[in-house]
């Protein structure tokens, strides 16, 4: 979302400073010092530090049960977002995704000006008539009942419709014309490790995605289904013992859009192991929840060899996780090309 907003503002001549979570494909970096008056920054709620920011415009895309090791409960996480949404000045704007129930729940306690976006007819900025066309997505934008026009983005998935709607809402608040917004979104070429196509070899396409939360995984797999009519093989490396424990039940239901799931050991990310929190338990649970083709490979160094026994011409392999699972995708491409 942040990178789309920054791209649209840059296209509109605002030359913003940008600090984004992932590297923009167009820049090869995740930060750029601009000469304009705006800074577009990706806020991090994981440790509560986002409450140290003083935004003029804030965008809240979703609130999922994440980082509960820091907050202790969902109620405390929601309270932090209530504070964040109301930190804007009187002339500012909070932009909220109306379709996300936890974000929607902020509205009764909003003390400052806000705008909404989503598929809901009640959203200020609404997407209608969504069409998926390979790696492109088209939809019509409605603003408070008035048709603004058609948008095309060069990436699949409903989550990217939401991301672009957020960018449209921000740019509209800054009085940017719809045609300029449309051109800016059409020029957006994506972010590294966000549905990044790594290459194709032997008729097998490899995509890498940073998604490590169940909702992110579902969104990525759904986007793959929208973009290609192929067998989908998801290669997932769980990230953090605490996240695996806290969202265990949600992970079990996150992979139904994949034909085959390959799991490897948990990427600790500096955490100490938690007793009885194991990737093997995820493997067993996903099978018990009805998935027909699940594999567990504890040693990630052996993933590529196992994948070579699984993949067929025409398959789509997606590496998923915030750790180093992307290396398995790159090695698979090398092996398929005969380089290793």
Protein language model features and the residues they cover:
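Hydrophobic alpha-helical packing residues
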Residues: 5-9, 286, 332
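Short internal beta-strands
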Residues: 93-98, 234-237, 258-268
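C-terminal helical cap/extension that packs against the catalytic core
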Residues: 252-313
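P-loop/Walker A phosphate-binding loop and immediately adjacent motor/lid segment at beta-alpha junctions
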Residues: 76, 84-92, 112, 219-228, ...
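Nucleotide phosphate-binding/pyrophosphate-handling subdomain across enzymes
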Residues: 57, 135, 143-260, 284
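Phosphate-binding loop of NTP-binding sites
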Residues: 1-96, 102-113, 165, 227-228
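Beta-strand->loop->alpha-helix junctions that form or flank phosphate-binding loops
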Residues: 18-22, 112-133, 152-158, 182-186, ...
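A glycine-rich beta-strand to alpha-helix segment
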Residues: 302-333
